[in-house]
Swiss-Prot record:
Cellular component per GO, a single term: virion component
Protein name as annotated: RNA-directed RNA polymerase
Post-translational modification: May exist in multiple phosphorylated forms.
Subunit and partners: Interacts with VP3 in the cytoplasm.
Function: RNA-dependent RNA polymerase which is found both free and covalently attached to the genomic RNA. May also contain guanylyl and methyl transferase activities.
């Protein structure tokens, strides 16, 4: 295609079609194609200005806390459990680990990158080539309809009005203040336990809205939650011969930021350090619990002191989320992501991921369940939702994280929690952890967790990610609500939405646009807003059937006119109708689809960026994926994407690049890859491939630990209110005696051995007295072993069950800075003598800090000198 604006006739036709009237000296192309946008200068691009803005808006800035410098230690010394990994081929642990146990301390800093910027305005350029291709195709249609013109107009408007990028410091700060307002403003956050809820009553609501099953499979059960991370990797066999590695660690995005104290590095680059710090934290916690930590007095002080040493576990990096923003709000709206410290992320993921990844339970496969967790709109998923909407019974609701969907009086409501994460309290997360432990980590009534993990989940993890802190520039500031992006974000948000629906049920399900429904905000301290409402929803959906236009899924031809859609905003999806399949099928909401088409994200996978030819491969993936998620329904967008993808394919083939290898893992290159997870589909869009993608299949069978009440959430809400529901006073069916059944296997074996020994040596009055006393001694020894094992199992289980009911949250108090100039003082990089032996160092090495000047260095603390002397004595004793 030559440039569409080269021809005078084309320019005239474009002017007439789009109402463009260039004056003297103006060009049609300049008026239609937006120029490169240069963002304004960021007004808060310095720590002092950012601190002042936050303080003026009542935002809490914390006294800067320092970190010990990282020092190198041999991996085998720190992680002896994983020494075998250093002997196998392939990706293994590094020979050394860098741990925060140095003899100098520093104030950390983190300066996120914001693009586009005034200096780099074209960091993420719009897809002008796609726009020109669509204009060219538009000109080829003799009598183009308004629908086709709207496609070009919508793409042009998105290029003109929006930009893809990561915002500004001003946008981040404004978002922080808005989150604070949600948490503390007109409907301040409230502790659900003070509203009459209990952990168990909330769990029984979640039994309906988020049913879960145990981790692992029937033929491969998961290991109990009783180990440190390094022992979740189990070697079977011999590293010199045949071996297998059983991996019980959670799936983690290793390309994401590692957080403190490894700013600028990824989790994949610091995986050994992540495991080592997690190991030692849990071991120290376990040791303190055995000493009675968590109770009043000195033992509790020891626990708080340990948590103070590990303060960085609760301090996330505040980075800007790259999105497609309105240019007009570039300085006021930037979504923040709270990047959890890697060990924090790992430990919480060890609780949540094994359960949630193995619980494909939702509205599609469980009667009465309103959950959209793991819902996929393809393969008949969206058609099932439309059938649910069309059914006459109402009111009714669906829920996914901070999204609520209600059908009431034949009106569809899409409701979002307002800045959802800001509504969360530590007690909400405690309830979520209680649910995952008692419902997920349960084997026929036996808890699969110990006291250490229960204490971490219930009493420590909530303080690490809710109302904790974050780092931006050299400022350490408070986080209001939960940090967005932590390993429990989804569950916490889903719990908040569940409470909203519970109150709605207790109010006899009023209309969402009523004042009565709005009053739920004040009652719960949870803010929400109606994002979209569609009246006569059933009538509008029925109209899609006769109005469906010929296309890929209605006749197997390329579309000439778009089929109408109903924009449900169902996790971003709309509905249209396929005559060939006889069902409703998903297309991405039109605004979102054309916005995605306007601004490519580019190759986000850093490991792929360096590959030669990856940019052309990305174009193939991008254009075909746009068609798969709904572009196929819009004639100009579909054809333009098809042409541009073909051009990129030809380029790769001409250069001799192995196209199949590039596209084998195409979902890694697509922002929509998650929607196609688990689908074996070809990337080239054809009527056949689209039909295969949308043809209904039976839903996955559910995996639940306990039956779901088919009466739904309404029945459970009412039963809980009247006290008629099962086991309200109990602990979710986790019974101490049932636990003992599984925990006492060793005791049973010991008793069996004693009985076997007794039978093998009958009581013979003529037997030698020495032999008889030996037999008696063996019997007593076996019985003693059985007794001790039984007692230990009962005590450990009792401690675990007691911990999972605890409402305490343990966190040190970190002082606030009143003067913003003090908070933003450029102390970053300033090195100070270490004030203490950190918990990591003491646990790993049994020693405090070491100084280049020797043991008697004047800058050393008394504790450091004491620990160094102890280490020296230990060293001498080994020689």
């Amino acid at each position: 295609m030559s440039d569409v604006f080269n021809s005078p006739q084309a320019r005239s036709k474009i002017s007439a079609a789009f109402g463009i009237k260039p004056t003297a000296g103006q060009d049609v192309e300049e008026l239609l194609i937006p120029k490169v946008w240069v963002p304004p200068e960021d007004p808060l691009a310095s720590p002092s200005r950012l601190a002042k803005f936050l303080r003026e808006n009542g935002y809490k800035i914390l006294q800067p806390r320092s970190l010990p410098e990282n020092e190198e230690y041999e991996t085998d010394q720190i992680l002896p459990d994983l020494a075998w990994m250093r002997q196998i081929e392939g990706p293994v642990l590094k020979p050394t680990l860098s741990l925060p146990i140095g003899d100098q301390e520093y104030f950390p800093k983190y300066y996120p990158t914001h693009r586009p910027s005034k200096e780099k305005p074209n960091a993420y350029p719009p897809d002008i080539a796609l726009l020109k291709q669509m204009i060219y195709l538009f000109l080829q249609v003799p009598e183009a309809t308004d629908n086709l013109k709207d496609e070009v107009t919508l793409l042009t408007q998105n290029i003109r009005d929006k930009a893809y990028g990561s915002g500004t410091y001003m946008g981040q700060a404004t978002r922080l203040v808005a989150m604070k307002e949600v948490a503390t403003g007109r409907n301040p956050n409230k502790d659900p336990l003070k509203l009459g809820y209990t952990f168990e009553s909330i769990a029984q609501l979640l039994d309906i809205t988020l049913p879960v099953g145990p981790p692992g499979e029937d033929d491969k059960p998961w290991v109990p939650l009783t180990r440190v991370p390094s022992r979740m990797l189990v070697l079977t066999g011999d590293v010199d011969g045949e071996f297998e590695v059983e991996d019980y660690l959670p799936k983690i995005n290793l390309k994401s930021s590692s957080g403190l104290p490894y700013v600028g590095r990824t989790k994949g680059e610091t995986i050994g350090e992540m495991i080592a710090i997690s190991n030692q934290f849990l071991r120290e916690l376990s040791a303190l619990l055995k000493q009675g930590a968590g109770t009043k007095g000195s033992n509790k002080k020891k626990l708080l002191s340990m948590l103070s040493d590990y303060w960085y576990l609760s301090c996330g990096l505040l980075f800007p989320k790259a999105e497609r923003y309105d240019k007009s709000t570039c300085c006021t709206k930037t979504r923040n992501k709270w990047s959890a410290q890697s060990s924090t992320h790992l430990m919480i993921s060890m609780i949540t991921w094994p359960v949630m990844s193995n619980s494909p339970n939702n509205v599609l496969n469980i009667e009465g369940c309103p959950s959209l967790y793991k819902f996929n709109p393809f393969r008949g998923g969206l058609n099932r939702i439309v059938e649910w909407i069309m059914a006459p019974d109402e009111p009714k609701a669906l829920v996914y994280a901070d999204n609520i969907y209600i059908v009431h009086s034949n009106t569809w409501y899409s409701i979002d929690l307002e800045k959802g994460e800001a509504n969360c309290t530590r007690q909400h997360m405690q309830a979520a952890m209680y649910y995952i432990l008692t419902r997920g980590w349960s084997d026929n009534g036996d808890p699969m967790f110990n006291q250490t993990w229960a204490t971490f989940a219930m009493n420590i993890a909530p303080a690490l990610v809710v109302d904790s802190s974050c780092l931006i520039m050299n400022l350490q500031i408070k986080t209001y609500g939960q940090g967005s992006g932590n390993a429990a974000t989804f569950i916490n948000n889903h719990l908040l939405s569940t409470l909203v629906l519970d109150q709605w049920n207790l109010m006899k399900q009023p209309s969402p646009d009523s004042e009565e429904f709005k009053s739920i905000e004040d009652k719960l301290g949870i803010n929400f807003k109606i994002e979209r409402s569609i009246d006569d929803i059933r009538g509008k959906l029925r109209q899609l059937v006769p109005l469906a236009q010929p296309g890929y899924l209605s006749g197997g031809v390329e579309p000439e006119q778009p089929s109408p859609t109903v924009e449900l905003d169902l996790l971003g999806w709309s509905a249209t109708y396929s005559k060939d399949l006889g069902i409703y099928v998903p297309v991405l909401d039109k605004e979102r689809l054309f916005c995605s088409a306007a601004y490519p994200k580019g190759v986000e996978n850093k490991s792929l960026k360096s590959k030669v030819g990856i940019e052309q491969a990305y174009k193939v993936v991008r254009y075909e994926a746009l068609r798969l998620v709904g572009g196929w329904n819009y004639p100009l967008l579909n054809k333009a994407c098809k042409n541009n993808a073909s051009a990129a394919r030809r380029h790769l083939e001409a250069k001799g690049f192995p196209l199949d290898e590039f596209l084998a893992e195409w979902s890694e290159l697509s922002e929509f890859g998650e929607a196609f997870e688990g689908f074996n589909i070809k990337l080239t869009v054809t009527p056949e491939s689209l039909a295969e993608l949308n043809r209904p299949v039976p839903p996955k069978p559910p995996n639940v630990n306990r039956p779901v009440n088919t009466g739904g959430l309404k029945a459970v809400s009412n039963a809980l209110k009247t006290g008629r529901y099962r086991n309200e006073a109990g602990l979710s069916g986790l019974v101490l005696l049932a636990t003992a059944r599984s925990r006492l296997q060793d005791a049973v074996k010991a008793m069996a051995e004693a009985e076997k020994l007794h039978k093998s040596k009958p009581d013979d009055p003529d037997a030698d007295w020495f032999e008889r006393s030996e037999t008696l001694s063996d019997l007593l020894e076996k019985a003693d072993i059985a007794s001790k094992v039984a007692h230990s199992a009962l005590v450990e289980t009792s401690d675990a069950l007691e911990a999972v009911q605890s409402t305490s949250v343990y966190t040190p108090k970190y002082p606030e800075v009143k003067n913003p100039q003090t908070a933003s003082h450029p102390v970053v990089g300033l090195h100070l003598p270490a004030k203490r032996a950190t918990g990591v160092q003491a646990a790993l090495l049994g020693a405090g800090t070491s100084r280049p000047m020797g043991m008697e260095a004047p800058t050393r603390s008394k504790n450091a000198v004491k620990m160094a002397k102890r280490r020296q004595r230990q060293k001498e004793s080994r020689q």
